[in-house]
Amino acid sequence: MEGPGAAAAAVGAGPGGSNVSAFLTKLWTLVEDPETDPLICWSPSGNSFHVFDQGQFAKEVLPKYFKHNNMASFVRQLNMYGFRKVVHIEQGGLVKPEKDDTEFQHPYFIRGQEHLLENIKRKVTSVSSIKNEDIKVRQDNVTKLLTDIQVMKGKQESMDSKLIAMKHENEALWREVASLRQKHAQQQKVVNKLIQFLISLVQSNRILGVKRKIPLMLNDSSSAHSMPKYSRQYSLEHVHGSSPYAASSPAYSGSNIYSPDSSTNSGPIISDVTELAQSSPSASPSGSLDERSSPVVRIKEEPPSPSRSPKENEPSTTTAAAGNSTEQPQPQEKCLSVACLDKNELNDHLDTIDSNLDNLQTMLSTHGFSVDTTALLDLFSPSMTVTDMNLPDLDSSLASIQDLLSSQEQQKPSEADAAAADTGKQLVHYTAQPLFLVDSSAVDVGSGDLPIFFELGEGSYFTDGDEYNEDPTISLLSGTEQPKPKDPTVS
């Protein structure tokens, strides 16, 4: 069985078969063998060969020349060397041909031309060209991918930087929040302490009350204020005993000063505040008339000073005291004890003032003396500024009043003790607001914001050498006669 195959291989290698493959040599021998013509043989033209009955050919012929009996492997090897199957027209129909005939042909596989077998080469796939094309495509793709990767990398780096910045900002914000929480806690503690302090003040004020500071004379504030609290007794006391006349005044209760029907918010009111009692020069005028009087505010006479606003705006009052004197005693230094009075005491005091005014009117009408009241009202009017006051116009009237009072005291020296309540009169002007005299314990007399009239207790309000010494109204305040004034203006 192996004789024909080996012989064919030797034959193929003999005539130059060194360049011809063993498959081609075996195929040439197989086709040339006359014993295999019923299964494989040349075509009539000699350009191709036919294979009949592929099954029988695979079983009987292929094992003799090849190591297999698979027809499919034989056909695949033919295709590898460039043999192509020839298809006839009758074989392309739907009807299966009666005869199993397969024809293969190759340009260099021709009958009688064995030397052409050298030209038959086994097909080699062009891997290099395919690889080159693939490499080009891959390089383009790789370049594009690299570009895209670089872009994505740049974006990623920017996002990373933004995330890092946001992280730092977040940490800073958290630190700030922590510090703010600590500050808020501290501030809350401070606020709580302040609230507790204010609550304690309010509670203590409800129990003890707060004394209100009251501005006195020469205050131009016209705003109305509430009544001060806590009633005290009101008294006028003499400090020095150089005057032969001791001005005695009973301690008035709060009901005697103001009454409900008194016009505290309307025009000026002239009322009697003190009563002058004639006493011997040896009498001691420095004694206190009321042992229960509140602490004393000393009033002294000083030169006029620039007006200073009080710490709190409260009703302004103007007071003028007219004293009765026939001689020229030494100026009396008066101490003013002030208290905040209740409603009943104010009413009683106002009743006393009304009665004193009636007595004064009766006294003036009895002696046929007339006083220019309009000038006095203008003098003490709250709407009139101190620079508009013309005190020399009132010289005659005030001097006449002083002479009249002096003459009455000389005519009735024996009735001084019996009628002590009707002899001496002191004029006090009440404006639209009620008169409140301030306690020295509640008001800082030495403060720069209080009016000058609080300091009258230390000396004369009008100093020596000043042009105000010639004002007769000053004699009423000091208890001494003064010459005619030149032309002063009150500041």
Swiss-Prot record:
Span list, region Hydrophobic repeat HR-A/B: 135-208
Segments of this protein annotated with the region Transactivation domain: 333-491
Annotated spans, Disordered: 275-333, 464-491
Region feature D domain, mapped onto this chain: 208-229
Motif (9aaTAD): 374-382
Keyword Mitochondrion part of the UniProt annotation: no
Subcellular location, record wording: Nucleus; Cytoplasm; Nucleus, Nucleoplasm; Cytoplasm, Perinuclear region
Keywords: Activator, Centromere, Chromosome, Cytoplasm, Cytoskeleton, DNA damage, DNA repair, DNA-binding, Kinetochore, mRNA processing, mRNA transport, Nucleus, Stress response, Transcription, Transcription regulation, Transport
Principal subcellular localisation of the protein: nucleus
Region described as DNA-binding domain: spans on this chain: 20-125
GO MF entry, a single one: protein homodimerization activity
Listed Low complexity bias regions: 279-288
Tissues expressing the protein: Low expression found in most tissues with the exception of blood and liver. Highest levels are found in the pigmental layer of retina and in the lymphoblastoid cell line MSB-1.
Domain of life: Eukaryota
Protein role: Functions as a stress-inducible and DNA-binding transcription factor that plays a central role in the transcriptional activation of the heat shock response (HSR), leading to the expression of a large class of molecular chaperones heat shock proteins (HSPs) that protect cells from cellular insults' damage. In unstressed cells, is present in a HSP90-containing multichaperone complex that maintains it in a non-DNA-binding inactivated monomeric form.
Protein name: Heat shock factor protein 1
